[in-house]
Amino acid sequence: MNHTDTSPIKLRKNWNAREMQALFDERAGRTDPRIYTDEDLYQIELERVFGRSWLLLGHETQIKKPGDYTTNYMGEDPVLVVRQKDGSIAVFLNQCRHRGMRICRSDAGNAKAFTCSYHGWAYDTAGNLVNVPFEAESFPCLDKKEWSPLKARVATYKGLIFANWDHDAPDLDTYLGEAKFYMDHMLDRTEAGTEAIPGVQKWVIPCNWKLAAEQFCWDAYHAATTAHLSGILAGLPDGVELADLAPPTVGKQYRAPWGGHGSGFFIGEPDLLLAIMGPKITSYWTEGPASEKAAQRLGSVERGSKLTVEHMTVFPTCSFLLGANTVRTWHPRGPNEVEVWAFTVVDADAPDDIKEEFRRQTVRTFSAGGVFEQDDGENWVEIQHVLRGHKARSRPFNAEMSMGQTIDDDPVYPGRISNVYSDEAARGFYAQWLRMMTSSDWAALNATR
């Protein structure tokens, strides 16, 4: 049995910008495999990618009432996400300023304050230090305003909660850019918006976080192989044979001109959605009042009912799969491990039986034990296992597919558009990764636009 050692591969003490520039060659379509294994590159990622990007932290319906909270991560930093009395959301480092203990150790709940279990320092729901045991006797000069946890910027987009440590970063709306157009296919089908089905699934995969994030960014290509055959066979409704389903061929891929976001989608071919989610979800998505409402709201029948399956990554680690409606964050856990946090969203005004069907089918397909999820994870794990070898890390990976075949003036879809089977969005993903890794701050990043 293959065993993937998740200990980091230590190759060098540091990287300079010139050396990092050689890790990805967009013009040639070449990626250096060391980006998936090197510990020092990973530490730079934590600072320059995860410390400066807008990161997904959940859905607003997961914290409905004042005091409702969830615990989450931004990179490897634990954070608290808390609904405030005025309806706003606060995000702050889940770390007591006294000795660094985690302030809150629960996954979710409702609280009026948070008290560190080590020495009892207490913080309000906005992250302000409000009480210190024996303050008068032992801390006569303590300025509590100076000893609150680090607070992040918070913004939402149509129900999704994002946060950013960098106060010089562009606002979320600017950061997303035309990616919002593609996010709306899942998030804005109805004026009621979306809601998260209760529960977050969490599991660990021994692979680099970029392998997972980039697949959701560009890779419809793997769906044309036999990798998911077992999952398709398991989900076929009665009376439908595998031979009856045509492989999808009509679709497009989106790459953000700048920013690293990417998406791929199929148009007018419901067979793939039928194979993944079954007839009930397929019917809800492609015909009847819900699809008509979506077509009207999104501006075209193509976007409302014929765009049946879409994969997307908002750089760096927010990914979702429209149709299955799984939303996830790829939390890095060193260069050789990622922790997946996934939940399911549905139209808030969908009938209860449709919501239940989304829950049931997503658990069956894209969850910790999902039949499709396991196939994807097996590929990523095996790649990481192979990269333990010195020779395996010494030759570049190919990212040439559909190079030079993109357009910037599609009449319907904004951004850089190519055929659905393309590496274009992957090239955009790694181009943004490289910009962030080699830029000292957001001023330098903005200069590369």
Swiss-Prot record:
Binds 1 [2Fe-2S] cluster per subunit. GO terms for molecular function: 2 iron, 2 sulfur cluster binding; dioxygenase activity; iron ion binding. InterPro entries: RHO_NdoB-like_C, Rieske_2Fe-2S, Rieske_2Fe-2S_sf, Ring-hydroxy_dOase_2Fe2S_BS, Ring_hydroxy_dOase_asu_C_dom, Rng_hydr_dOase-A. Transmembrane segments: none annotated. Its EC number is 1.14.12.26. Pfam families: Rieske (PF00355), Ring_hydroxyl_A (PF00848). Keywords: 2Fe-2S, Aromatic hydrocarbons catabolism, Dioxygenase, Iron, Iron-sulfur, Metal-binding, NAD, Oxidoreductase. It is an enzyme of class 1 (oxidoreductase). [2Fe-2S] cluster binds at C96, H98, C116, H119. It catalyses: chlorobenzene + NADH + O2 + H(+) = (1R,2R)-3-chlorocyclohexa-3,5-diene-1,2-diol + NAD(+). Residues 54-163 form the Rieske domain. GO terms for biological process: catabolic process. This dioxygenase system consists of four proteins: the two subunits of the oxygenase component (TecA1 and TecA2), a ferredoxin (TecA3) and a ferredoxin reductase (TecA4). Belongs to the bacterial ring-hydroxylating dioxygenase alpha subunit family. This is Chlorobenzene dioxygenase subunit alpha. It comes from Cupriavidus sp. (strain PS12). The gene is tecA1.
